[in-house]
Curated annotation (Swiss-Prot):
It is found in: Cytoplasm. It comes from the Eukaryota. GO terms for biological process: formation of cytoplasmic translation initiation complex. GO terms for molecular function: metallopeptidase activity; translation initiation factor activity. This is Eukaryotic translation initiation factor 3 subunit H. Belongs to the eIF-3 subunit H family. Keywords: Cytoplasm, Initiation factor, Protein biosynthesis. It comes from Drosophila pseudoobscura pseudoobscura (Fruit fly). The lineage of its organism: Eukaryota, Metazoa, Ecdysozoa, Arthropoda, Hexapoda. Pfam families: eIF3h_C, JAB. Disulfide bonds: none annotated. Component of the eukaryotic translation initiation factor 3 (eIF-3) complex, which is involved in protein synthesis of a specialized repertoire of mRNAs and, together with other initiation factors, stimulates binding of mRNA and methionyl-tRNAi to the 40S ribosome. The eIF-3 complex specifically targets and initiates translation of a subset of mRNAs involved in cell proliferation. The gene is eIF-3p40. Residues 21-153 form the MPN domain. Component of the eukaryotic translation initiation factor 3 (eIF-3) complex. The eIF-3 complex interacts with pix. Interacts with mxt. InterPro entries: eIF3h, eIF3h_C, JAMM/MPN+_dom, JAMM_MPN+_peptidase_M67A, MPN.
């Protein structure tokens, strides 16, 4: 997945800034259909986005799914080129402008996502990644978001330096790895007319599910994922603390060795003997490699996302609970009368 955009030419060499993403209804329907089909098998759905760049708007007009990774006989690069070549023959936009993937329990931030978008953005400057949340959309809230890597994140990945010092220098945190790009859905006038006619034919929704309080499974999934991420972050913290303890012990040993050498050199100087250089002692203490903090940063971002989703979900559930209680009290009062 990480190098699927690696061999495509840049679509535009001028300004690579995208102010917003405009997605056709057809492309949205194809993404939604693919993501929901793969979610039934607990697989991650991924695909390519096709379109063009107009001024500072990225227009997504079509898309197609990537072949499943389990098919070893499939050449992914050749598959993509073949699909785009055939789309070009029928006069369909065939420029590769990004990719999409489904989301797992409302959380899409991962190391694989970061690597893939880095390869796309360094080869296709205007590319975006569109994330579709299947679980939230299944509850009636269409969740479609577009992201791009920030310049700081791209620079950090180019340098290949994920140490704490690099994060501080570039001022990179989990909240500044990706920048969300506004996304709008556009339909043709004929599509809007058809949707209006279909809306009149559909039966009116009575709205009896709006106050449904059966939300235990959704909250349980978020809590389980949150606990797993917190445990991963704890393990990362333990490893980093061990590194700091080793560095502190090494510095203490080096300082004691240098102090001992200074005393010995003072004795040698008083006797007129040549002194020993400090570099001989320093060579004995090799600097410890600094552990990368990228995984911990991504895990922190996942924890933050799950916490926000839980807070939002609980506030909605509490509102439903109070409304239901008021309706129940009103019903009981009416029955008493």
């Amino acid at each position: 997945m990480a190098n699927r955009g690696g061999r495509h030419a840049r679509t535009e060499d001028s300004d690579n800034t995208i102010n917003y993403v405009q997605c056709d209804g057809l492309a949205v329907m194809k993404m939604v259909k693919h993501c929901h089909e793969e979610s039934s098998n607990m697989d991650l759905a991924q695909g390519a986005l096709l379109g063009l760049v107009v001024d500072k708007c990225l227009e997504i007009t079509n898309c197609f799914p990537f072949p499943k990774s389990g098919d070893e006989t499939m050449d992914e690069e050749m598959y993509q080129l073949t699909v785009m070549r055939r789309l070009r023959r029928v006069n369909v936009d065939h420029l590769h402008v990004g990719w999409y993937q489904s989301s797992d329990v409302g959380n899409s931030l991962s190391l694989a996502l970061l690597e893939s978008q880095y390869h796309y953005q360094t080869s296709i400057e205007e590319s975006v990644v569109v994330v579709y949340d299947t679980q939230k959309s299944a509850r009636g809230f269409l969740c479609l978001k577009a992201y791009r890597l920030t310049p700081q994140a791209i620079q950090m990945y180019k340098d290949g330096d994920f140490t704490p010092e690099a994060f501080r220098t570039l001022k990179v945190g989990y909240e500044s790895l990706f920048a969300e790009i506004p996304i709008v859905i556009k339909n043709s006038p004929l599509t809007n007319i058809m949707m209006s006619e279909l809306n009149e034919l559909l039966p009116e929704d009575k709205g009896h599910n709006f106050l449904d309080l059966g939300t235990a499974s959704v909250l349980e999934n978020h809590m389980r994922s949150l606990i797993e991420r917190v445990d991963e972050l704890y393990q990362e913290a333990v490893r980093y603390n061990k590194y700091q303890q080793v560095v502190f012990k090494q510095d203490s040993d080096k300082n004691r060795a240098l102090a001992k050498l200074a005393a010995e050199n003072a004795v040698r100087t008083s006797k007129g003997e040549p002194t020993v250089a400090e570099e001989e002692v320093i060579k004995q203490f090799r600097p410890m490699p600094v552990p990368a903090r990228l995984t911990a940063t991504i895990t922190s971002g996942q924890i933050n996302t799950h916490s926000q989703h839980i807070a939002q979900f609980c506030s909605q559930s509490l509102a439903k609970l109070f409304i239901t209680e008021s309706l129940q009290n009103a019903k009981e009062a009416k029955e008493i009368k």
